[in-house]
Swiss-Prot record:
The gene is ERMARD. It is found in: Endoplasmic reticulum membrane. It holds the Pfam family DUF4209. The keyword Metal-binding does not apply. It is linked to Periventricular nodular heterotopia 6: A form of periventricular nodular heterotopia, a disorder resulting from a defect in the pattern of neuronal migration in which ectopic collections of neurons lie along the lateral ventricles of the brain or just beneath, contiguously or in isolated patches. PVNH6 results in delayed psychomotor development, delayed speech, strabismus, and onset of seizures with hypsarrhythmia in early infancy. It is a multi-pass membrane protein. Changing I377N: In PVNH6; may decrease protein stability. It comes from Homo sapiens (Human). This is Endoplasmic reticulum membrane-associated RNA degradation protein. It comes from the Eukaryota. May play a role in neuronal migration during embryonic development.
Length: 678
């Protein structure tokens, strides 16, 4: 791919960041006695370490460069010490001090990585260590504090942790992982800036020792305060079932990926070892490890494309402490910091952007990079299916950066052709638009069950008589008029229901499915579109709650009838409930149809002026208020079935009045040429 042809990139670290990580800690050549750092029993001598931390002249801040320089020999001694131990000795001496973390079994694995001397494995170990440490420190914070800071930097600066571990100890951690002015090991690795050879292994060894030392300090604190450390539960990734688009990665696909990795311009040569280890981890069923490496390298590669397309080559490098890094947040944004259009989304296309937003950014998506980097996921339970999706997407992305002749060869493989086809057809699964479609269809299914609810035959005639009143008839008349109006705004096809007393159960679900399968643009949705979606989703959720309550109440009353435990008043209430249900079923179905049609035309809201928009928002919020009241009236506690009829009549009048103003989105949108087949 010509877009990335240029001089080979030898580092993604800016000069000063490269200097502090790769050079500064090696300037002092003095030997440091390991016995002054850690005892034979594995007890950390914190004073030796904290004495190496330098401060500015005013003593108001840390001298990060001076501290890294002085800590260099200490890290060297610790690294040599660990390499001199057998794994058994390491575990006997240090394993007890990792129990305070929520992932103590990680540390013997890191020890193995250190002994292997393989740079990518050591970098991966540091990433996992920093995420584990962050999670554990958050648990400690909650011994005293109430709301744990989201960023590690803010966590390390908190008074709560200083109270537990001392400020001098927290300053040591800041030098290693807590500030862009220091080594900043967490961020340069998790954001894919550091190549394997650029992370000195001794810093990994030092982080192991610091974690053990923190465990020792915490034990003393807990003994003195009589407090007990509780670990927060790991989170479960959300909406994963919706995100499984690609089939399982086969050995054939893996072999193609291995070949493409060597030839795709997307991968920086200095980063290739990470990709190679990622595949090794996948084959050995270490799916979280594979995902971590893929995510960091997707960020690296996309940052390179971003910097090239937007002609800002310096954005490829780590920023200095005075500027922001270029991370996924900026890479996947619509605009650059200066307000210009980001060229990357235009180059990648909507399907690829939607995939990345689904996995990384959407609040209702799995946000796997965030959760992995903050230590919120149990790595042992990370699913193969999730890693499958990342691997398949990565292959399709890499193929965009090989020459056309090679691409043609790979496309001849049916497995590769299928992945490309699926990737090109991808649409968001985590955007509020998709979630609303899911809600509508789920709620429709729930309401359809009402027709199957049992009702005593001997009560049917009485229930029908209750329905024959002026207000109920007025409701049915309004439903017919509203439905007629909505059906005139179907995409091209028009169909009018004449008999709402007999809901067309065969065609109604199909109609909603067709509407919910209509593509709606989701990438970079305007704020007002998202505001309307929030209200529509709330309406749908209240409809679901009503449906659930109706089902539960009906089944309970029928059981009581069969068991002959219904008292006289309860029997009358049962009749009113059944009469109400026969009205609520078409009303809720009408609301779902309205939601689906407004959703198809959701972007028409951008054409409203401020006054029109506020009027429209008031309208949809009035429907929300109605459904919220329905939830209250149909609850087991209130059981006000008669009142739902008056409530419904008032709501339908408001809906019809607003409809006559022709200010709904269906009235503003241009006619679609797509067909809804009934």
């Amino acid at each position: 791919m010509e877009v990335l042809i240029g001089d080979p990139i030898t580092t993604c670290l800016s000069p000063s960041v490269y200097d502090i990580i790769c050079n500064l800690g090696f300037q002092l050549r003095e030997n440091c006695d390991i016995n002054s750092i850690v005892t034979q029993n594995g007890e950390v001598c914190w004073k030796t370490i904290t004495d190496c931390v330098s401060y500015t002249e005013s003593e108001q801040g840390l001298d990060y460069w001076g501290s890294v320089r002085l800590l260099g020999p200490v890290c060297e001694a610790v690294h040599s010490h660990f390499l001199s131990l057998t794994k058994g000795q390491f575990e006997i001496r240090y394993a007890p001090w990792f129990q305070w973390t929520s992932f103590p079994e990680l540390f013997p694995e890191i020890f193995d990585a250190l002994e292997s001397l393989q740079s990518p494995a050591i970098s991966l170990s540091l990433m996992k260590l920093t995420s584990c440490l962050e999670r554990a420190l958050g648990d400690v914070f909650l011994l005293i504090g109430k709301e744990c800071p989201f960023l590690l930097r803010d966590l390390l600066s908190s008074e709560e942790l200083a109270q537990v571990f001392s400020q001098s100890v927290m300053n040591v951690l800041k030098v290693f992982v807590g500030s862009p002015c220091g080594l900043n090991l967490r961020n340069v690795l998790w954001h894919g800036f550091a190549s394997p050879e650029e992370i000195p292994p001794k810093y990994c060894s030092m982080m192991i020792l610091l974690t053990a030392g923190l465990g020792q300090l915490l034990k003393s604190y807990l003994q003195n305060t009589k407090l007990t450390l509780a670990h927060r539960s790991f989170i479960s990734l959300t909406n994963l079932e919706d995100l499984i688009v690609f089939p399982d990665v086969t050995y054939e696909v893996l072999s193609v990926l291995e070949e493409v990795m060597m030839k795709s311009a997307f991968i920086l040569k200095i980063m290739l070892p990470y990709w190679e280890v990622a595949l090794v981890k996948f084959k050995s069923h270490r799916f979280a490890d594979c995902a971590i490496l893929l995510l960091t390298q997707l960020e690296t590669g996309l940052r390179n494309v971003f910097a090239t397309l937007n002609r800002c080559p310096k954005r490829l490098l780590t920023a200095e402490s005075t500027a922001l890094y270029t991370t996924f947040d900026q890479i996947l944004a619509k605009h650059l910091n200066d307000g210009k259009i980001n060229q990357l989304p235009l180059f990648l296309g909507e399907p690829a952007m939607e995939f990345l937003w689904d996995f990384l950014n959407h609040q209702e998506g799995p946000r796997i990079r965030d959760h992995l980097s903050h230590g919120e996921i149990n790595l042992h339970e990370f699913s193969k299916e999730t890693t499958n999706q990342l691997l398949a997407f990565s292959l399709v992305l890499l193929l965009r950066f090989v020459d056309d002749c090679l691409l043609s060869v790979f496309k001849e493989k049916s497995a590769v052709e299928l992945l490309i086809s699926l990737a090109e057809g991808y649409s968001s699964r985590c955007h509020p638009v998709f979630q609303l479609k899911k809600q509508v269809l789920s709620c429709e299914e729930s309401i359809r069950v009402w027709a199957l609810l049992p009702f005593p035959e001997e009560l049917t005639r009485q229930a029908v008589r209750l329905e024959d009143n002026s207000e109920t008839n007025a409701c049915h008349s309004l439903i017919t008029k509203m439905t007629d109006e909505l059906y005139h705004h179907m995409p091209e096809n028009r169909c009018v229901l004449k008999d709402l007393d007999r809901l067309p159960t065969e065609t109604w679900p199909q109609l909603l499915r067709e509407l919910c399968s209509t593509p709606v643009p989701t990438l970079f949705c305007p704020r007002i579109v998202l505001e309307v979606l929030v209200v529509l989703r709330s309406i749908s959720e209240q409809c679901r709650r009503v449906s659930s309550q109706v089902t539960v109440a009906s089944e309970l009353r029928h059981r009581q009838w069969v068991e002959r435990t219904l008292r006289s008043r309860q029997r009358q209430n049962y009749l009113r409930m059944w009469s109400s249900i026969r009205l609520l079923s078409p009303v809720l179905s009408l609301i779902l149809l309205l939601i689906a049609l407004e959703l198809v035309n959701i972007h028409a809201v951008c054409g409203k002026n401020a006054h029109e928009y506020q009027q429209y928002l008031k309208f949809v919020k009035s429907i929300l208020q109605y459904t919220e009241n329905l939830v209250a009236y149909t609850s087991y506690e209130k059981n006000k079935w008669n009142e739902t009829i008056n409530l419904t009549h008032t709501a339908l009048l408001k809906m019809w009045t607003f409809s006559e103003k022709k200010q709904m989105l269906i009235h503003l949108a241009k006619k679609s040429t797509s067909k809804v087949l009934l």
